[in-house]
């Protein structure tokens, strides 16, 4: 008897899931904007490394060219 009840509950849950597919709750639809996941210091470090390596590469290519 318990197994039949479990199967019935699973069938109801599955059919409810099928009928509500595509319906998004209003709370998750109008979520506020999230902050950037990267902090300003980490962003500054990343820009420093990228620009510094580009400048270093330019200087190195000028030295090798002469």
Swiss-Prot record:
Compositional bias (Polar residues): 17-30
TM spans (from-to): 39-59
Major subcellular site: membrane
Keyword DNA-binding part of the UniProt annotation: no
Entry-linked Pfam families: RAMP4 (PF06624)
Signal peptide per UniProt: none
Keywords: Endoplasmic reticulum, Membrane, Protein transport, Translocation, Transmembrane, Transmembrane helix, Transport, Unfolded protein response
Membrane topology: Single-pass membrane protein
Compartment(s) of residence: Membrane; Endoplasmic reticulum membrane
CC terms in the record's Gene Ontology section: cytoplasmic microtubule; cytosol; endoplasmic reticulum; endoplasmic reticulum membrane; ribosome
Region called Disordered, residue ranges: 1-31
Presence of keyword NADP: no
GO annotation terms (biological process): endoplasmic reticulum unfolded protein response; glucose metabolic process; insulin secretion; muscle organ morphogenesis; plasma membrane organization; positive regulation of growth hormone secretion; positive regulation of insulin secretion; positive regulation of organ growth
InterPro entries to which the protein is assigned, alphabetical: ER_stress-assoc (IPR010580)
Subunit structure comment from the entry: Interacts with SEC61B, SEC61A1 and the SEC61 complex. Interacts with CANX.
Family membership: Belongs to the RAMP4 family.
PANTHER family, sorted: STRESS ASSOCIATED ENDOPLASMIC RETICULUM PROTEIN SERP1/RAMP4, STRESS-ASSOCIATED ENDOPLASMIC RETICULUM PROTEIN 1
Free-text function comment from the UniProt entry: Interacts with target proteins during their translocation into the lumen of the endoplasmic reticulum. Protects unfolded target proteins against degradation during ER stress. May facilitate glycosylation of target proteins after termination of ER stress. May modulate the use of N-glycosylation sites on target proteins.
Protein name stated in the entry: Stress-associated endoplasmic reticulum protein 1
UniProt organism field: Homo sapiens
């Amino acid at each position: 008897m318990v197994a039949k009840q479990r199967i019935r509950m699973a069938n109801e849950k599955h059919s409810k899931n099928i009928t509500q597919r595509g319906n998004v709750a209003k709370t998750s639809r109008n979520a506020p904007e999230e902050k950037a996941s990267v902090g300003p210091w980490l962003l500054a470090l990343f820009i420093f490394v990228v620009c510094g390596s580009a400048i270093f590469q330019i200087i190195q290519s000028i030295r090798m060219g002469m």
